[in-house]
Amino acid sequence: MKIYIDADACPKTLRDFICKSVMRTKTIAIFVSNSFINLPRSPFITIKVVEQGFDIADNYILEKAQANDLVITSDIPLANDLISKGVAVINFKGVEYNKDNIKQSLGMRDFMDMMRSTGVLEPSQMGKQKPFSDKDKKTFADTFNRLHTKLSRMLKNDLK
């Protein structure tokens, strides 16, 4: 199992949590970004800097992630594509995307995108994204730990 992180939008507190967790559990984490980010030195932590451009990091993650890997991203179309490959996906707020909820999330995202692009929603009506809270961090940590444990157990069972 590998963990891929869509690192450009990942809050620093989550990067720190993920790094500590993968060093403790000896799990490989690959932070994918279009610019360098400072991460701890560890044989379990890699940063993959991709070219600048639309969906370059997403395409790298989609190409490399395999069934039973874990991807951390808030990109809903990417999550949809990954789920169809059997990849576990969570966002930065700790929401697990799966085959039961991804279509609804994708539909809402597309609807809001259409509302913005047609001018029905003005920027002032959209509101600002809420700041990342301690509750968000706890929810993320709980979901991350649950999925990490589940995927690790599946891997161990496959090796038997």
What is the predicted role of each segment?
Residues 1-160:
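Nuclease catalytic cores that cleave nucleic-acid phosphodiester bonds
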